[in-house]
Design a protein with these regions (language model features):
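C-terminal cap of metal-dependent C-N hydrolases
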Residues: 28, 100-106, 111-112, 180-227
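Acidic, glycine-enriched loop/beta-strand segments at the rims
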Residues: 88-98, 142-151, 159-196
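Hydrophobic alpha-helix feature that most strongly marks membrane-spanning transmembrane helices
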Residues: 67, 82, 102, 106, ...
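Active-site neighborhoods of metal-dependent hydrolases
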Residues: 1-143
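Hydrophobic face of alpha-helices
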Residues: 74, 132, 148-155
Length: 230
């Protein structure tokens, strides 16, 4: 669906299916999907993360699947959508841009990784390792930002921006949300081929005053709560 133009998605799934099947609108879709693929780095840069219809496609590029099916990549993309869709990992970011943005004082650290059951499909490894990657790669190894700046971007800055009082800081009266780690031990283990791996080096995590990770292991506690803007 990431390659499908918005006009084709108007009025829901049934209308999208009709447009993909109608010769006139399908020709238009093929042209626009081809353009969208090119803007995203090409078919070889699009990796299937999860396919409910055909799990054998997971981990393969759209280019590989198209070659296997003897189709143009844009045709394959439309066929995958018609069959129920698939989630993708897209390699189309500039490392220089990422580091420049990371250095800005207003940049917060987050992730749009999907919340899928552990072991289900091949989601982007950021689902498990986004924050560990920043601490390991961009703080410790590449020294793009300081540890203090990185921690602020993950804690007090988001809390301030979203109006979450008594969050993101360690002080009397604030909620006890704590992460205890040694910077030199933080290590991202999730990969594109094996993404369901929890990052290493987090000794303890406390949520709302309750320990949820102890000695690197999950406890059975679930003290999290939905936060609303104050």
């Amino acid at each position: 669906g990431a390659f499908i133009p918005r006009w084709a998605q108007v009025d829901g799934e049934a209308e999208l299916q009709r447009r993909m099947g109608a010769p006139e609108t399908r020709r238009r879709l093929i042209e626009e999907v081809r353009t969208n693929l090119r803007r995203r780095g090409g078919a070889a840069s699009q990796i299937i993360a999860f396919s409910r219809q055909d799990r054998s496609l997971e981990g393969r590029s759209l280019a590989d699947i198209a070659e296997m099916r003897r189709q143009a990549p844009e045709e394959t993309a439309l066929d995958l959508v018609a069959a129920g869709g698939a989630s993708i990992v897209s390699f189309n970011m500039s490392e220089d841009d990422l580091e420049h943005i990371m250095r800005q004082s207003y940049t917060m650290t987050s992730s749009d990784g999907g919340l899928v059951p552990m072991g289900d499909g091949k989601p982007h490894p950021r689902s498990y390792g986004a924050h560990a990657r920043k601490l390991e790669r961009y703080v410790r190894n590449r020294k793009v930002v300081s540890l203090e700046s990185a921690v602020r971007s993950m804690t007090s800055l988001p809390a301030t921006v979203f109006g979450l009082t008594n969050r993101g800081v360690i002080q009397t009266g604030a909620w006890a949300d704590l992460a205890i780690f040694k910077p030199g031990e933080i290590h991202e283990t999730a990969t594109y081929n094996d993404p369901h791996q929890v990052a290493q080096g987090m000794h303890a995590v406390v949520v709302n005053g309750i320990v949820v990770i102890e000695n690197g292991k999950f406890t059975s506690a679930a003290p999290g709560r939905v936060l609303s803007k104050n």
